[in-house]
Amino acid sequence: MFGAHANDIYVTQSGDDLDLDITQDGQNNQVGNSTTASSVIGASATIDIDQVGNSNVLKFDVNGANYTGTFNVTGNSNDIDILCDSTGNNSSCGTVTASITMVGNSNDIDLDIGETTDASNTTATITSAGSDDSNVVAATIDGVSAILTITVDGDTNNWLLDIDGDGDVNGHTYIHTHTGGIADVDVVQSGIYDNMVTITTSGDNHDIDISQTD
């Protein structure tokens, strides 16, 4: 009988203009682990991570002025935790473009941007690319201008979104499109300028709560 094998990658990098590509194919693989994130500190970072398989862990912490992250996850029961500006180093993740695409069931995804200091500009997308069920997605974005777009296809999914910060003249924007049944969506959006939430849903047994404050 053969035991289950896993690949582990730990990244600790300091410096400008990083271009990092990681691909893991298999199960029980890790980039960082459940308690310690891989970390990058620098003025500019482009990160592309693909994980294929079940029960993988991806925990990554980025601090820098400009950050582009692309994360693709295919499989079930994966734990994804993407952090930006946990320590407030090096311009506090000023301009952020983040894209997370998942295909699979029972995944847990956390996206946290501007944890210590507001991010200046954030454009983030989270896409469920198939009929994906029983996923939990939490996104917390603190920033001056945030655009978050979520596209969901599947049943029994839970979405927890918190967007705050002063906002610029355009405020914050949240666009949510969902096809499927049994959805729990909680949106908290705040800022001193105009904020917009657009939700389009199709399916039964949806529980949607939206809170907007200046």
Tell me what each language-model feature is.
Residues 6-214:
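Low-complexity repeat regions of mature extracellularly deployed or surface/particle-associated proteins
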